[in-house]
């Protein structure tokens, strides 16, 4: 899991594996193995170097939800986390769009993203979020739980 989070931050920063390894002072081979999940227990020293280079808090590398809730401001962070969870768990884009449209009708405040309603015109933004979802493992159960909570 931590490897996927490192990869997500690395890509957001626009770094190649080689660039991150050089700037962090870590082995490119080891970094690659961490990202691919071959090694799943990197040292704290390694994580400190990588997180400093990526300009993220060390704690953010340990928990995908922490990362998503702390990095993004406003109400969209919860949506982003749960969209990522839904797609990672195998929910198809069209199914997710249908689901969120149904929720929009039932609970209008839960179907906004960046203070806008989910529509055909902004579906590309949602698709971009779903692409990020493939980088982080989250569950459909957590999406449903979140949506129930937001609907109260």
UniProtKB/Swiss-Prot annotation:
Cited InterPro entries: Bact_TransReg_Diox (IPR050807), Cro/C1-type_HTH (IPR001387), Lambda_DNA-bd_dom_sf (IPR010982), SinR/SinI_dimer_dom (IPR010981), SinR/SinI_dimer_dom_sf (IPR036281)
Molecular function as annotated in GO? DNA binding; DNA-binding transcription factor activity; protein dimerization activity
- Give UniProt keywords alphabetically: DNA-binding, Transcription, Transcription regulation
Keyword NAD assigned to the entry: answer is no
Q: Which domain of life is it from?
A: Bacteria
DNA-binding region(s) in UniProt: 17-36
Name its GO BP terms in alphabetical order: regulation of DNA-templated transcription
Domain HTH cro/C1-type as annotated: residue spans: 6-61
Say yes or no: keyword Transcription regulation present: yes
Q: Name one Pfam family in it.
A: HTH_3
Q: Which residues form the Sin domain?
A: 113-151
Report quaternary structure and partners: Component of the SlrR/SlrA complex.
Give the function comment from the record: Represses sigma(D)-dependent flagellar genes and activate the eps and yqxM operons. Repressor activity is regulated by SlrA. Controls the initiation of biofilm formation.
Q: What is this protein called?
A: HTH-type transcriptional regulator SlrR
